[in-house]
Amino acid sequence: VAYGRVDTCSMLENAVAHINNFRPNVEAVIITGDITDRGELEAFHVFREIINELVPPWYVVPGNHDSRENFLEAFKDCYYLKNGSDFIHYSVDDHPVRLIGFDTTVENKPYGFLTEERLLWLDNCLTEKTQKTTILFQHHPPFCTGINHMDVQNLINGKELIQLLTSHRQVRH
């Protein structure tokens, strides 16, 4: 239950049922963070109980409400999270398009920020496979959305990300 009043569990259960019944079949589900309200491990476990009912594979990155430590504990069995980095980013080539999950979070802060290390990782990852269409997913948008209370929590250096992406044609934006 988020914010003490919204039954997010029922909403997630309904979404999972809808995705599982969707035709044509959904090939993958991308989850871009804020899985929990306050980062509690128990909340991650509740999420896992529900999301494990999904038929298609699912891929997840943390949001600013998610504790990195508890996130990694809750998803330690997800093969794609085994990158050995301090940040939670990865690439998956199991689909017709390449998926890159990218960690934009700053622990205990609402906004996102990409260190040079993270930007270099992404640049190297994108340079590896230039011919395969790629979907990059992350929690914080790199641009203003027009939602004022969200735009103050955006990706602080989003322009740097957009600049990097312009040199990689396989990521459409």
Predicted regions and their residues:
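Short acidic, glycine-rich surface-loop motifs adjacent to enzyme active sites
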Residues: 129-145
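Active-site glycine-centered loops adjacent to acidic/histidine catalytic or metal-binding residues
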Residues: 33-34, 63, 102, 139
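Extended active-site neighborhood of metal-dependent phosphoesterases/phosphodiesterases
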Residues: 40-129, 133, 153-170
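A short acidic, helix-capping loop that chelates divalent metal ions and anchors anionic groups
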Residues: 1-2, 69, 108-111, 144-148
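N-terminal active-site segment of His-dependent metallophosphoesterases
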Residues: 1-46
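Short, basic/glycine-rich phosphate-binding loops at helix/coil junctions
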Residues: 1, 26, 97-106, 141-144
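Short active-site segment of divalent metal-dependent hydrolases/proteases
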Residues: 36-37, 66, 142
